[in-house]
Design a protein with these regions (language model features):
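Active-site acidic carboxylates
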Residues: 1-91, 158-177
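Cofactor-binding loop segments of dinucleotide-utilizing enzymes, especially the Rossmann-like FAD-
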Residues: 13, 53, 122-124, 147
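Histidine-anchored nucleotide/phosphate-binding helix
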Residues: 37-41, 126-139
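Internal catalytic-core helix/loop-beta-alpha segment
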Residues: 72-125
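Short, charged, surface-exposed secondary-structure boundary motifs
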Residues: 102-103, 152-156
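A short glycine-rich beta-strand->turn/loop micro-motif centered on a GG-aromatic cluster
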Residues: 118-121, 141-154
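A generic "structured core" feature
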Residues: 131, 156-159
Length: 180
């Protein structure tokens, strides 16, 4: 398979209406404030994988969390600021917390053959965590953009950041990826 020229792959994790707006079914308080940063990162991304929860009406996850991101609802959609309308953005729907549960992700990563991953979105200590730690298993550098994530539990997020850096991950800010 031919190697893609893209070396860095950005991951926009679950920035969906149900999570990022106060009217959302599973709102993460303050998440709307990261949207401008997420939008900027997405526009700068050489290649972007945007994950989306895509639940059925009777999804088993609703035994743990309230109904959210049901396929076809407004809440499942991504805010316009996060969309590129560009072939650099790949939308990856998933039914579980971990984006690696999607059978489409690992073949895509193999095809892209990235040298580095940049991760941001919601929820820091849940789905962002799953993505970041899953990507660390590739053996490639992984960064979490700390001003482009939002947590439900700030203490758990701090613990996750400590665990992540101890495992070899890096923390950064969006300034690193600001256009010059």
């Amino acid at each position: 398979m031919k190697r893609s020229r893209m070396k860095t792959v950005f991951f926009d994790i679950d920035t969906q209406i149900d999570f990022v707006y106060p009217s959302g079914a599973l709102y993460v308080p303050g998440a709307e404030h990261i949207l401008p940063v997420v939008g900027q990162l997405n526009r700068h991304a050489p290649f972007l994988i945007s994950t989306m929860d895509a639940h059925s009406q009777d999804d088993p996850e609703f035994q743990i969390y309230p109904h959210h991101c049901v396929v076809g609802t407004t809440g499942q959609r991504k805010p316009a600021i996060t969309l590129l309308n560009d072939p650099r953005q790949f939308i990856l729907e998933k039914q579980q917390l971990d984006c690696f549960s999607s059978p489409r992700l690992e073949p895509l990563l193999a095809q892209l053959d990235a040298d580095r991953y940049v991760v941001y979105g919601v929820v820091t200590e849940i789905c962002v965590r799953c993505a970041a730690f899953g990507l660390l298993k590739t053996g490639k550098p992984v960064e979490i953009v700390t001003d482009a994530v939002k947590a439900l539990d700030e203490q758990k997020a701090r613990e996750m950041f400590a665990e992540f850096t101890a495992a070899g991950g890096q923390l950064t800010t969006s300034n690193r990826y600001s256009p010059t």
